[in-house]
């Protein structure tokens, strides 16, 4: 049995410190597929703690009974450390020590294990208020506020009741946060935890209640009618209950910010924002330092309240401005600079905002909003573009369709419209809201830019498991091409330390000289990359890396770093979250691993090309092996051909790769892997060969 060590990260961009004591001997060659489903971290309870204290936490994973925990990986500000990580029946337990000077706010926690590598992240909040742990044995539990109650709704029909004393002359805020922590269920409990919050007086009468105030999370602000004892009741809106239904109930009379205005700033520039929310005094501001995160948004908070009562804040790359009122008509339209962003909000129900966009040269223009995306603002925007005469030339309601590798809760109701300015002159964006949402939280960001070809990159998983020292595994890169980008994008894995090997690939674009094919036309959508661990690596070794894309188009050189994704749910669209860093981690071997001397093979549709394969890792007695060629496609399936058994002599063999008739001419990148589901919802290819380039010629 292994002696557990500690893996900790102190702050973003810092070095790793690994104190790993005793290694588990690697198992004999296995034939099972890599257990990607066991990588899923489902909950952390409690999901927060107070500065200067130690907290015993419980981690639940999909298969905790098979999870050999090695440590906890922590991303975020310094001041949080993990110890005594251990398996206890079907849960994993650890103690988190929070330093007295730890900065309040969120941390990302991941489990590191021998069998599966690194899990997805979940949030743990460091706060300043006293913390209370729910006692499930009590029907009612008395709490003294201000405090944060850590609870969970389990089992079905569970209703947690917390009694507290309140006075009529003191305002109160109660906020039950579950979706804010990304609390969610799996299987039959699939989806975010959706809570109902009620406050009852001594006779059981409801004096306040809420649902879906901040996203799905309920918040009530009240003054109780008389001094006395009151009860907060927290339950699931569907009367469900399960151990992963974790929440944090804030009870306070301190300011609770729920929104910031402006709702974003230019990346790399300091700014001052106004915080608004229950009990927040008018004019409360906070000055933010220059923020340089590669992610689209960060979280900001207020030191007077609990650490995870924070608000999202979006980072942009162009000039920022504030909406000026009145701007309720074309004649009073506020300025919107091309290449810039205006921070705005709907002040009252029925409010309509107008913005003037002066176009110097004819050409395509994109105008879009950010509201639900990243901000979870309650507004549903529509954009109309009008010319100087008032004629509508373009409009859009919902401009961001959802698809696999989704990073948002639902299909976003944000708007995006692209129109062509046929001549220089003023154009006007009329922005209105469709649900009646208004007030301090009804914020949005309106951006305008020249609609030039560009791209963004997403990559999954953010923790790539390498199944054994010397072995190779794949990750998938999703390419979001913008405005008819028809140039190829070079993708590369960069930042790996000496001994690790990353691959390169070219993501080719759809053009007239590259005829489309229904299933295998992955032009501009997804591409596999691979990482190979050093042969001298050990289970638990991990390293950071980044995926970079470069493209030359129209005389411009574009370069973007991929945003890594962590998976929460498996489904037709999946639910992913952007995380702060990409890592590769060595896990226990899953039987033989694969090598190839081929870096490129060439053929035409219908032809068969030979790919040399060498099997390593206890494979001396193998006389055959089933392999699958994997190629990232437009969908979730990635098996290019059916699994095929090849003969081995002294660990070497040849795989006959049949180039299908449907494959269009172009450059593709594939791996050969041990047979598995061939579906990126199940996992990634691995153990597999390093990436091989397939050049498909015209017949």
Q: Could you say what each language-model-derived stretch is?
A:
Residues 35-82, 87-91, 100, 126, ...:
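Acidic, Ser/Thr/Pro-rich low-complexity intrinsically disordered segments
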Residues 54-60, 90-119:
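Ligand-binding face of N-terminal immunoglobulin V-set domains in extracellular IgSF glycoproteins
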Residues 121-123, 241-244, 438-441, 554-564, ...:
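Beta-sandwich strand segments
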Residues 85-90, 101, 212-214, 224, ...:
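Short proline/glycine- and polar residue-rich coil/turn motifs
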Residues 27-31:
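Boundary at the C-terminal end of the N-terminal hydrophobic targeting segment
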Residues 121-145, 306-340:
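Predominantly extracellular/luminal regions of secreted and cell-surface proteins
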Residues 123-131, 248-254, 289, 312-320, ...:
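Short beta-strand edge segments in extracellular beta-sheet folds
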Residues 11-25:
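Bacterial N-terminal signal peptides
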